[in-house]
Amino acid sequence: MFTPRLSPTVSGYAMPSIWPVVPIIAGDATIPAVGVRLAGEPLTELILSRIVAEINDNPILDGITISGGDPFYNPFALLALLRRLKEETHKNVWCYTGYTYESLLKDETRRPCLDYIDTLVDGPFVQSLFDPALSFRGSSNQRILHLSKYR
């Protein structure tokens, strides 16, 4: 899943922050979205239900990756999305963010999201540290943190 919103200070990402933040419906509450879209459409409760069903109906899928933009741009919507995906699919969740793990731990609004992420790839993409030989990350300052190993 791609979340298109970026912090204004982030540069060098392949996808610019061009889409507006729109609401998604999560459970009984309307929550400001992270800007998640499916084929350019806002992620609604109906679409998310279909995505969950497709994930659960596909035996070859073993995980979900959330990237962007930055998924942590709107932590309240991210938490609702992660909770729903994790609880209803029980899949391994990877998440890419420009924030560092340490800064997320210190942030009371973003920290709860970490409970639903199995693997976090943290740190901003830095063009001067780009290395095409790296697995699962774009620049050498980014770390792959297997959070589920410590729960």
Region annotations inferred by a language model:
Residues 1-32:
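N-terminal pre-triad scaffold of radical SAM enzymes
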Residues 4-5, 12, 32-113:
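Conserved Radical SAM active-site core
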Residues 10-12, 21, 63, 90, ...:
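Glycine-centered flexibility motif
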Residues 22, 71, 125:
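Hydrophobic pocket-lining residues within nucleotide cofactor-binding pockets
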Residues 56-59, 89, 98-151:
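Auxiliary Fe-S-binding modules of radical SAM enzymes
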